[in-house]
């Protein structure tokens, strides 16, 4: 049973999570190994990309560069290099005619050439002869290779198989001076015809080429015989082929070197071939409009020379699509599928594969022109069925007629009917990328639709599909687009959507359904499908308002960021723009609300935009393929109007980060996104770094005395957000899919206006002045702070999401240039926790300060005065060179005031310090002076999170508790202006130390006045930790002022039973009647599965009188969740045993609780490793490492005495 609510988002409490998502330490001689990337699962799992080629004649033959007038200086895209000049190679054999680049002359600044000697300008040839499918092929595959040998590669433009000036107008360039830089003529006019000429371009200087559409006369152009002088009245033709990747003339930017000395043009499919598995869907080439659906042309697979399955490593790919030594493309990489279709057709099918189909579709000489009708919604439905594993629709793939007719319908490629399962891993992301024109035809024969006008009989397999009703889904989308209910339903069943051929927008209904509802209930978690689409804009028709474009609707509703708690069936309100329109762009530069370009929608209005769109789509696709979230923070602890939740995300495909703000519904608690992190232009961003005692702008000229002194201006600008130098060729910088780096362990921190009532009863120095300070700051801009692995602390306006400033700590600089490298492997930079507080400065008065750590990113600690977020000030920026005891601080720094009046930062030093031991670090917040309190000299150790305690409940800290990685819990006492340390307890199991990673939690038992400390043991810092199955434990200790000698003075609590209640894995614990002298312990051993390495690496928390603990059970057998599963447990804090009444409501919210074999449930299982839960009212939300959230009801009042408890609000019981 699936209990997940939304994805991707990881939820956790405000308490620090140690080791939940782990990363690199950046330490040269690290004693404690810390992984360089997150360990919580899905690492290196390849994504699935299905390419939907809605290729019929407009997609193939439409003009790519739409401008009818050639403009010198404007770059036009196609197979030719705009920065090269070409000559034409004539041969009596047509197949041997082509253009080839020349080393000299070189193009002029406006892409023109000195055309004497038979030279042509490559930029002009792109404008003149490029069809829409050409840049699509170029971007995806490198282009259609008509000749592909070790020594030579020649590309050929798409076939233009019919007369159609509407799709490719006949053009003219006028003016001898202009033409002299483009073509080798002395003409005043250069008239061009492409339509109806196959792979050729015809030209003349006279209008007969235009006025006579039946003109078939054209002499093959030969520069040695045709000087094209001023009086030439001839009509000539050239074959539009071009030699590429010729080292003698300079390599194009997409040429890749191979071991045998060849260079081959490659595209995005090859570039991402190690990270994505591909499949392709297309149509049968049948000209009847009564032919339904699409067919699978190439099944989901790796296309490169090796497969890259994480559990197998690199292995030779038996279905590779190119030679690893030469780069030459194979004609038939999937011979089994070709042979199967051969048997059905009765004629040899000799071509197969993803790249081949994309390149050769419409190019094969089967004796039939390209397809006329395009039922695109049914094509999408074919892919929809593939991912849902519903099986092929036989009527879609049937081949009929004679052998030749079957061959033509197959278009000389496989028509695959024995579908496999494209989803190999439950955590794979699945993506569709489509291309087509909006003038679609007869595509309504889908589940739920009863309008059969101009449709054949609906296939029985389609009738049997009850998983979707496209009419209801479409009506729902129209409601979300603002229609009234009746109008929406009327539109959903209308005979046509936006064209006269009885088309529909059901592609959007399918895309929405697949994007928001689990496609595969048989697999763990939710399997969803994200849609990207390229509109080729047939005949320049953008379909404005854009909501009349079915591809825009499909990309919007199949690609929006699904909010937390989203109900895909009941939602009818408009989507928040923050979920689908973050690019700020408009279709066709039409600055109107009805022309906003959805993030996953791209237009091929010209070839330049086509290529840019596809590159952007792939960068987003790769980012989505490994998407996950970090955690949630809030601007309020109460559910009321104005409450906002902030979610940090990372996308490991390109290591991009994001921050999203959600409005919280005050009645239901539902989240509605209203902004994403957004940035000023890179030149205008406020980015600072510490130079001695002041802040300076993060620019090349200011960094000469830092670890970035060797960086180039391009690298520094890249770090600032300049993306103009990104690319995959030498000299370029790493391609990103966004400006901000991934956010993994840094919890977003909201800092709003001060609370003037905070210190009304306090009597320490400055307390009486706080109310005035709060009043002065009442209207300051609220800010959300978060650290990212781009080397920066980011500060965002909490109302708008716009970045106010960023800060680069010194400790992040030494390895920051790696972030710009094309071969970048994940690094951690500013990955630590943040804290903020108002402190009193006897000289300047009250100030708001922020303290941050680098966590896994390095050994650094910094403090900023953020009283005025628009004018921050540096307090200090420290590294381990300043504080010798500082290691990788993996916990939240705490700000506290001690009895001497000093405001201090308290934190555990973390592992990998210079001395390699555990120390408490106490820093004067105003001066940066650090005191180090070592607790032992034992190496391979570090102090974890600290729990400050005010024994007098006056806000003055006089005691601190913290554990270390060798299992000792320490008590630090501040007296006589000094810190004294003593061990309280050492956690062991059968004599072996149990590491303490999480911050302990304290409480006073009201009935006895005894001080209790609660914590669990275990760690998860490296893959070795994940393999470790040693027993860890949960402890509740009484601090009686002396060291607890061992377990003999503690009572034992056991996990006594496990089972399933209403689909939930549950467990119960024992109910001890006698409490040990010094507390209790519970070994995390399953009564059914035994020792599994279950551990507790996140802090405990209170919910009323219940103690909440979260455990994790690692599982290296599942690549999707290496951190495994776990339990959220609720027990009596002062006995360690089960509660006297139910805590988890497992009976469908009925309030009757849950019991296992008559005993109240003590723990609920989560299929992916859980984080600390978050409570909203009586709803408990459990965020897990796989990005899912499980929601359960808990008691709202009564015996559990529900109150919010923190270290300042101490729990006391009667």
Swiss-Prot record:
Residues 307-334, 438-460 are annotated as: Disordered. Ca(2+) binds at residues 952, 954, 956, 958. Residues 311-322 have a biased composition (Basic and acidic residues). One of its GO terms (cellular component) is pilus. Residues 443-460 have a biased composition (Polar residues). InterPro entries: PilY1_beta_prop_dom, Quinoprotein_ADH-like_sf. It is found in: Fimbrium. The keyword Nucleotide-binding does not apply. Its main location: other. Residues 1-30 form the signal peptide. Keywords: Calcium, Fimbrium, Fimbrium biogenesis, Metal-binding, Signal. One of the three PilY1 homologs of X.fastidiosa, which are involved in bacterial twitching motility as component of the filamentous type IV pili (T4P). This is Type IV pilus biogenesis factor PilY1 homolog PD_0023.
């Amino acid at each position: 049973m699936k209990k997940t609510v939304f994805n991707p988002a990881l939820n956790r409490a405000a308490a620090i999570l140690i080791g939940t998502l782990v990363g690199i330490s950046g330490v040269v001689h690290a004693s404690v190994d810390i992984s360089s990337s997150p360990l919580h699962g899905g690492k290196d799992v390849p994504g699935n990309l299905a390419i939907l080629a809605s290729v019929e004649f407009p997609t193939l033959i439409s003009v790519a560069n739409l401008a009818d007038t050639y403009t010198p200086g404007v770059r036009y895209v196609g197979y030719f290099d705009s920065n090269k000049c070409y000559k034409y190679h004539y041969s009596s054999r047509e197949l041997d005619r082509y253009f080839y680049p020349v080393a000299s002359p070189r193009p002029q600044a406006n892409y023109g050439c000195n055309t004497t000697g038979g030279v042509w300008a490559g930029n002009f040839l792109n404008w003149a002869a490029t069809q829409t499918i050409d840049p699509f092929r170029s971007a995806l595959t490198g282009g259609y290779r008509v000749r592909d040998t070790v020594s030579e590669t020649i590309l050929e433009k798409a076939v233009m198989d019919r007369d159609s000036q509407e799709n490719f107008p006949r053009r003219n360039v006028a003016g001898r001076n202009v033409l002299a830089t483009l073509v080798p003529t002395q003409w005043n006019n250069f008239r061009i015809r492409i339509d109806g000429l196959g792979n050729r371009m015809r030209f003349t200087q006279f209008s007969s080429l235009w006025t006579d559409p039946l003109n078939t006369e054209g002499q093959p152009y030969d520069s040695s015989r045709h000087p094209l002088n001023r009086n030439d009245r001839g009509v000539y033709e050239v074959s539009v082929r071009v030699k590429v990747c010729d080292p003698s003339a300079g390599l194009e930017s997409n040429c890749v070197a191979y071991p045998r000395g060849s260079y081959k043009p490659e595209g995005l499919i090859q570039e991402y071939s190690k990270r994505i598995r591909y499949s392709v869907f297309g149509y049968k080439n049948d000209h009847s409009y009564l032919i339904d659906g699409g067919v699978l042309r190439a099944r989901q697979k790796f296309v490169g020379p090796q497969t890259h399955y994480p559990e197998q490593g690199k292995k030779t790919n038996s279905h590779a699509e190119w030679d690893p030594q030469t780069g030459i493309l194979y004609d038939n990489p999937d011979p089994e599928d070709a042979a199967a279709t051969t048997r059905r057709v009765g004629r040899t099918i000799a071509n197969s594969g993803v790249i081949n189909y994309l390149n050769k579709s419409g190019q094969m000489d089967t004796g039939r022109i390209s397809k006329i009708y395009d039922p695109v919604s049914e094509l999408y439905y074919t892919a929809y069925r593939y991912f849902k594993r519903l099986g092929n629709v036989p009527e879609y793939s049937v081949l009929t007629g004679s052998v030749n007719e079957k061959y033509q319908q197959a278009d000389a490629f496989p028509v695959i009917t024995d579908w496999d399962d494209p989803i190999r891993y439950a955590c794979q992301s699945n993506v569709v990328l489509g291309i087509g024109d909006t003038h679609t035809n007869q595509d309504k024969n889908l589940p739920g639709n009863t309008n059969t006008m101009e449709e054949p009989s609906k296939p029985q397999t389609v009738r049997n599909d009850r998983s979707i009703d496209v009419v209801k889904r479409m009506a729902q989308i129209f409601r979300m687009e603002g229609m009234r209910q009746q109008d929406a339903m009327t539109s959903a069943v209308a005979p046509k959507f936006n064209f006269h051929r009885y088309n529909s927008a059901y592609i959007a209904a399918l895309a929405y359904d697949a994007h928001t509802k689990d496609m595969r209930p048989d697999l763990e978690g939710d399997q969803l499908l994200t849609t990207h689409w390229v509109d080729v804009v047939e005949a320049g028709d953008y379909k404005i308002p854009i909501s009349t474009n079915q591809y825009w609707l499909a990309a919007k509703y199949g690609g929006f960021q699904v909010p937390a708690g989203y109900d895909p069936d009941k939602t009818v309100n408009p989507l928040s723009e923050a979920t689908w329109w973050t690019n700020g762009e408009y279709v066709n530069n039409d600055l109107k609300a009805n022309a906003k370009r959805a993030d996953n929608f791209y237009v091929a209005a010209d070839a330049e935009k086509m290529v840019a769109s596809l590159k952007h789509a792939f960068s987003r696709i790769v980012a989505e393929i490994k998407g996950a979230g970090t955690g949630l923070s809030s601007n309020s602890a109460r559910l009321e109007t104005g409450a906002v939740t902030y979610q940090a995300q990372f996308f490991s495909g390109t290591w991009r980060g994001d921050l999203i703000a959600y409005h919280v519904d005050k009645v239901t608690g539902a989240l509605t996104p209203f902004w994403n992190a957004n940035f000023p232009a890179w030149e205008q961003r406020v980015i600072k770094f510490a130079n001695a005692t002041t802040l300076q702008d993060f620019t090349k000229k200011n960094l000469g005395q830092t670890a970035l002194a060797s960086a180039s201006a391009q690298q520094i600008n890249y770090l600032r957000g300049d993306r103009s130098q990104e690319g995959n060729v030498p000299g370029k910088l790493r391609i990103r899919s966004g400006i901000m780096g991934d956010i993994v362990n840094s919890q977003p921190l909201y800092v709003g206006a001060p609370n003037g009532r905070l210190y009304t009863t306090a009597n320490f120095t400055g307390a009486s002045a706080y109310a005035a300070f709060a009043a002065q700051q009442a209207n300051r801009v609220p800010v959300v702070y978060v650290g990212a692995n781009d080397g920066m602390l980011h500060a965002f306006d909490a109302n708008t999401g716009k970045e106010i400033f960023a800060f680069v700590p010194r400790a992040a600089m030494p390895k920051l240039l790696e972030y710009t490298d094309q071969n970048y492997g994940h690094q951690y930079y500013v990955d630590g926790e943040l804290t903020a507080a108002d402190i009193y400065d006897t000289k300047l008065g009250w100030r708001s300060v922020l303290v941050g750590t680098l966590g896994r990113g390095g050994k650094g600690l910094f403090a900023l005065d953020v009283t005025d977020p628009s004018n921050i000030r540096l307090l200090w920026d420290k590294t381990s060179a300043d504080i010798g005891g500082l290691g990788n601080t993996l916990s939240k720094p705490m700000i506290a005031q001690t009895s001497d009046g000093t405001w201090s930062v308290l934190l555990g030093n973390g592992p990998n310090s210079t001395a390699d031991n555990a120390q408490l670090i106490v820093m004067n917040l105003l001066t940066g002076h650090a005191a180090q309190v070592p607790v032992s000299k034992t190496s391979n150790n570090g102090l974890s999170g600290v729990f400050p305690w005010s024994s007098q409940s006056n806000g003055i800290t006089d005691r601190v508790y913290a554990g270390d990685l060798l299992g000792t819990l320490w008590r630090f006492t501040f007296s006589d202006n000094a810190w004294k340390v003593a061990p309280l307890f050492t956690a062991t199991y059968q004599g072996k130390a149990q590491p303490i990673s999480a911050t302990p939690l304290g409480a006073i038992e009201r009935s006895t006045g005894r001080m209790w400390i609660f914590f669990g043991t275990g760690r998860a810092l490296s893959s070795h930790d994940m393999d470790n199955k040693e027993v860890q434990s949960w402890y509740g200790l009484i601090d009686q002022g002396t060291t607890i000698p061992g377990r003999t003075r503690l009572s034992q609590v056991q996990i006594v039973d496990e089972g399933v209640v209403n689909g939930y894995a549950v467990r119960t614990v024992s109910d001890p009647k006698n409490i040990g002298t010094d507390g209790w312990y519970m070994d995390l051993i399953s009564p059914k599965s035994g020792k599994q390495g279950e551990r507790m690496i996140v802090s405990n928390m209170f919910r009323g009188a219940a103690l909440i603990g979260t455990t994790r059970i690692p599982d290296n057998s599942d690549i999707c969740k290496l951190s495994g599963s776990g339990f959220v447990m609720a027990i009596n804090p002062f006995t360690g045993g089960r509660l006297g009444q139910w805590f988890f409501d497992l009976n469908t919210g009925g309030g009757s609780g849950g019991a296992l074999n008559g005993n109240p449930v003590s723990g609920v299982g989560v299929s992916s490793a859980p984080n600390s839960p978050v409570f909203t009212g009586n709803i408990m939300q459990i965020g897990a490492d796989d990005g899912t959230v499980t929601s359960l009801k808990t008691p709202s009042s009564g015996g559990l005495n529900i109150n919010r408890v923190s270290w300042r609000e101490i729990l006391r019981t009667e």
